[in-house]
Amino acid sequence: MDVKDFIRTIPDYPKPGILFRDITTLLSDPEGFRGAVDALVSLHKGAKFDVVAGIEARGFILGGAVAHQLGLGFIPVRKKGKLPFTTIGQEYDLEYGTDMVEIHTDAVKPDQRVLLIDDLIATGGTAEAAVKLIARAGGNVLASSFVIELPELGGRARLEALDIEVLSLCSFEGH
């Protein structure tokens, strides 16, 4: 199965010059969704993780399914202000300003081995913030997996500089 066949490209969204890679078509197709989840699981065959973390919002869908297949728990990495219990946060830079991701203070146990999942890696800013946040909470992100990689935006190098393995199911040139 070629995961690219299930991904829709929308030009000039959310602004002119951007090619938006829409995975809702992958998620809504039973073959595409199962194939993507199975492929993400296969990327880490034999690896030892204690928990899967997924980045809001599409990382919840994929990460939850991967955690289920691996028989592991799931940690939601959320945007600021969305979690009901005590949180810790990690700020990261956007094109114009900053944002923050958060987890509950008790989400990560000391020295837990974490697999980080999201739908797409572009610049790697959000993923890097999630890695740093999990580390501050006492965990250790060993690897990250994405359905889509936009290689020219440098996200892979950003995570690899933190000694995080980066795997993706497909890549698209142009953004």
UniProtKB/Swiss-Prot annotation:
GO terms for molecular function: adenine binding; adenine phosphoribosyltransferase activity; AMP binding. Pathway: Purine metabolism; AMP biosynthesis via salvage pathway; AMP from adenine: step 1/1. It holds the Pfam family Pribosyltran. Gene3D superfamilies: 3.40.50.2020. It catalyses: AMP + diphosphate = 5-phospho-alpha-D-ribose 1-diphosphate + adenine. It is an enzyme of class 2 (transferase). It is found in: Cytoplasm. Catalyzes a salvage reaction resulting in the formation of AMP, that is energically less costly than de novo synthesis. This is Adenine phosphoribosyltransferase. The gene is apt.
